[in-house]
Design a protein with these regions (language model features):
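Sec-dependent signal peptide recognition
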Residues: 1-9
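Short extracytoplasmic
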Residues: 38-53
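Short amphipathic
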Residues: 30-37, 110-113
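Bacterial Sec signal peptide processing site at the extreme N-terminus
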Residues: 10-33
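Surface-exposed short loop/turn segments
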Residues: 51-53, 57-58, 62, 67-109, ...
Length: 150
């Protein structure tokens, strides 16, 4: 009886119509220009992530991006001796997505934040956190572009 139940479940789950979305099929656009405004390192990392994901030169949909980042660093945590133990980084990104064919402009605001520990490896911790936050921002921008074009 257990075998029959498992067999029936497998049959229904395999034929439910669920299909994974293949992002590579959705990438029918090319970024012709990325204009950056503020933080050079973060802007460069976002540009590299997007260019790596969107390298379809033969796509008919050409888009231009204008990216403006604001980075705020603040104290997140102190210990009993009032010494700083953690910092918080907020990255607020405003993106204009401009479609070349129609000159349609879409606005996108993204806010991400994270904390890193203060100490001997502070520079490495900060850089690693910034890289992680930039990947999140790039993924959100990419998803927004895919949803808008489809």
């Amino acid at each position: 009886t257990n075998f029959c139940v498992i067999l029936i479940l497998i049959f229904f789950l395999n034929t439910c119509g669920f299909k994974l979305v293949n992002n590579s099929e959705l990438l029918e656009f090319n970024i012709t220009n990325i204009e950056k405004k503020n933080n050079k390192r973060i802007d460069f990392l976002i540009k590299q992530n997007l260019k790596r994901s969107l390298s379809n030169k033969e796509a008919s949909n050409q888009i231009k991006l204008v990216i403006e980042n604001k980075v705020n660093q603040s104290v997140a945590e102190k210990n009993i001796k009032n010494q700083i133990t953690k910092y918080k980084i907020d990255i607020n990104t405003n993106v204009q997505i401009i479609t070349a064919q129609t000159n349609k402009i879409r606005q996108l605001e993204i806010s991400v934040f994270g904390t890193y520990e203060f100490g001997d490896t502070q520079a490495i911790n900060k850089k690693t956190l910034e890289d992680l936050l930039v990947k999140r921002i790039s993924k959100k921008i990419l998803n927004k572009i895919i949803l808008d074009i489809k």
